[in-house]
């Protein structure tokens, strides 16, 4: 049996403000984090010993995934204090384990046939097999050229348009023999595409490319994030879901939907969501615990967990992150992301492409035409101010300790003991 490493340390800067409070592998697709689909895919193909490499907001992933028991796998973690690169992080995660290793990116959606890829790897006697996918725009990925037997003889990471020599893109799924992993320097920043693969090709090592015809989408930016969910609702990707399909709408148990609501599929409604006399249509996704008020209309919109859309609001191509609120009469248009815990006031308009970073607020009747970010009005808390955020995200243990230390210093009487406590809820004020 082989083991697997999920590369899950990505920060996902191009997905901000979604990833301001979520690590990239925790971004939800149809109400379930991307990393869940990765673990389920590995389990499906018989790989049950998994290590996830973590760096950005690691506690969010560990709290959600636990020890892997809920997936039927054994899941451990390798946390990087400083980024080690793709290969360096895998080297740290594998350690002295001498088994063949499957590496998979924790921020891509795929139903690739890993069993078939493994058979290909063994039959070729490969030191490394890279799973490849034909794409129309290869400049965003590493590209490879293979001979008739699949052996890679040319590889280039993210070529310029003038440098493109192939449409075979690197999916970030690798099968590695132990001797290859041993070549990766320990404790150093080292990359598969920029360092390891070029070195192996230079030495004429047997590096092969398995071309998959299954679905694969890198969740690299907002457009790809939306596209992946459209593709899933269109049936282009095989995946497991708790929802049942009815008249084009996917509905999880526990959703509360008014008899007067219009669900014009394809769309997805998560457990515990409440939909009043509203319209949800055109690939919209409503996460668990989200609530939609009477007279509101959603098209091509994603509501993450515990969001609130009040009466007569209009959302077109928007994304609401966890805990965001939209008041009555507000209008939010295409390309907009409302960050975690943010609030769009009554009768406000958020124009195309403008976004609110977490914990921002638009007051009644305001228009937003550009991004409202943290830097624009950094809060300066006074004695009566409050600090608000999600545990392990904006409210990390380190930040809580710094807050306690700041209170102690400001008292003017040292030594002084300050207690930092929690009531166990996810959101703290």
What are these regions (language model features)?
Residues 2, 48, 99, 127, ...:
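Short acidic/polar active-site loop segments enriched in Thr and Asp
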Residues 2-62:
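N-terminal glycine-rich phosphate-binding loop and ensuing alpha1 helix
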Residues 62-148, 183-185:
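Conserved beta-loop-beta/alpha segment of the NTase-like Rossmann-fold superfamily
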Residues 101-102, 109, 115-122, 135-138, ...:
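Catalytic-core segments of class I nucleotidyltransferases/pyrophosphorylases
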Residues 188, 201-297:
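Extended, small-residue-rich solenoid/repeat segments and analogous flexible loops
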Residues 279, 294-387, 391-392:
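Glycine-rich hexapeptide-repeat left-handed beta-helix
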Residues 377-427:
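An N-terminal, well-structured beta->alpha segment
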